[in-house]
Amino acid sequence: MATHKPINILEAFAAAPPPLDYVLPNMVAGTVGALVSPGGAGKSMLALQLAAQIAGGPDLLEVGELPTGPVIYLPAEDPPTAIHHRLHALGAH
C-alpha cells in the first residue's frame, strides 16, 4: 500500500513536482474517478473494454498503449447475462 508523506508548503513552492502518471488522459493513476453519463450511453461497455485492454487484451478503443496488469471489474448494477452479452460482443472483435 502506498504511503504519503506530508507536503511542506515552502518546499512545494520552490521545487517542481514530479510528473503525474496517467491511466488515461485526465485520469491520474492511483486516484478515484467517476464515469458519468445518461443510461444507455455505453459506460459499462467502455469500462469493460478498458479492463480487457489493461488485462492484456487488444486496443479495441484505439486509445493507444495502456499499462497492463491485474484488473478487477465490478459491475454492481448488471446481471451476469448482460455481462456475458458484452463479453461475447468484445470477443467478436
UniProtKB/Swiss-Prot annotation:
GO biological process, one term: plasmid maintenance
Keyword set, alphabetical order: Plasmid, Plasmid copy control
InterPro entries the UniProt entry points to: P-loop_NTPase
SUPFAM superfamilies in the cross-refs: P-loop containing nucleoside triphosphate hydrolases
Protein function: This protein is involved in regulating the plasmid copy-number. Increasing the level of this protein results in a higher plasmid copy-number.
Protein name: Regulatory protein RepI
Organism: Escherichia coli
Gene (name only): repI
